[in-house]
């Protein structure tokens, strides 16, 4: 099974591990939002951020950790970029993760048609990552968009195959860890062949899917501490 990949992580100093609070910020769309209370940015919702935070705290009891979830349901890459200063840079996180992109594809076919090209997705994502690098010292974890098998989403699956290489290349350039969720789910479905086990619609994870993402998120987090 393919493992979560560390990219070009530089180690945290001993001081940052032991003498200060480490702020971890989750960013993305509905998969990250997961029903969080938007009046309280410490509310992690009921999706993978909640389970990932629990695993990270369990695995790293020596760290003083603060978790923030600012995912917003329905967001495309352009919308995430537009709000990224108040919902990202302003918090000056030590670790920031991003899971975005599936809505850019979905809106090509949904009732509110928005034609976002692959080139626009790449540019929006690049601008977000450049902003993180220029205006924070945060470690970056990128999680790829994914789509589990669903008969009504064949066009989306075809489009995703051209978006995934874009995200992968941006991760190589900017990220400290990359989580190839689409590949990881594909591998998992070889032994658990029912996509409904992880998601009722191929996109939004149920509890099993959220825990699956969280497990690989926690591995990525551990890799950037080395």
What residue ranges belong to the model's regions?
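Alpha-helical cap/lid subdomain in secreted, periplasmic
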Residues: 8, 18, 51-66, 79-226
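Serine-esterase "nucleophile elbow" of acetyl-processing enzymes
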Residues: 2-73, 85-92
């Amino acid at each position: 099974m393919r493992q979560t990949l560390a990219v070009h992580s530089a180690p945290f100093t001993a001081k940052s591990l032991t003498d200060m609070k480490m702020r971890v910020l989750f960013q993305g769309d509905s998969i990250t939002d997961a029903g969080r209370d938007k009046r309280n940015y410490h509310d992690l919702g009921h999706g993978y951020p909640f389970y990932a935070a629990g695993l990270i705290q369990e695995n790293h009891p020596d760290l003083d950790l603060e978790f923030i979830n600012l995912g917003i349901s329905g967001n495309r890459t352009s919308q995430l970029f537009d709000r990224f200063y108040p919902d990202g840079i302003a918090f000056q996180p030590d670790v920031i993760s991003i899971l975005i992109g599936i809505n850019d594809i979905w809106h090509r076919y949904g009732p509110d048609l928005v034609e976002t090209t692959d080139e626009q997705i790449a540019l929006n994502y690049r601008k977000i990552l450049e902003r993180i690098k220029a205006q924070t010292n945060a470690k970056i974890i990128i999680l790829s968009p994914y789509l589990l098998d669903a008969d009504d989403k064949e066009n989306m699956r075809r489009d995703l195959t051209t978006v995934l290489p874009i995200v992968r290349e941006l991760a190589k350039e900017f990220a400290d860890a990359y989580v190839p969720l689409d590949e990881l789910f594909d591998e998992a479905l070889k032994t658990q062949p029912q996509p409904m086990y992880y998601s009722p619609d191929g996109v939004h994870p149920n509890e099993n899917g959220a825990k699956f993402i969280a497990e690989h998120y926690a591995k990525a987090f551990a890799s950037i501490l080395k």
